Amino acid sequence: MMIQLRKGRDGPATLACVRADGSRTWSKVHPFFPVHDLTHCAVESVLGFREAFFGLVASGWSLDDFAPRVPLPNEARQAECIVGIFDLERAQPAPYSAAQFNEMVSASLQGQGLGTFRHITDPELTRVRELRSQWSRSWAALELGGTLEIPFPAPPDGGSAAARRSA
């Protein structure tokens, strides 16, 4: 699947997902969500999630299917907790250690009745941070009207985010 984040010229950004079969879903997004969604792509790719946000979209879910009334698979809820910790981390002066990160994930999951998740390793945390940072820089540098394209799942080397200008 190809993730396309378009920086709005006269309005909000849009997120579009073009599936392997050519079908697509899209939505306008609040300014908070482009980096949040890029973090989802990094987390889901590095940790191998296939039933979290982008995995569900790739399997046919519409972006509108993620309304609060729709029950999500456990993996999607776990991914949202993990992405939320990365979102919190962005506001900190330094990244969390693996021990801190895993403790926060554990507390978040238990607080939501989601049980436990395996230990996330230092190399996995580093890789997610690298991808998020690379893609966030590309998003920030994108001109209004431009589109950032990222494959999902990201290849092991992270692939390259392609920025293009809209006509």
Language model features with spans:
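Metalloprotease/metallohydrolase-associated module, dominated by Zn2+-dependent proteases
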Residues: 1-10, 17, 25, 31-35, ...
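Short active-site segment of divalent metal-dependent hydrolases/proteases
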Residues: 43
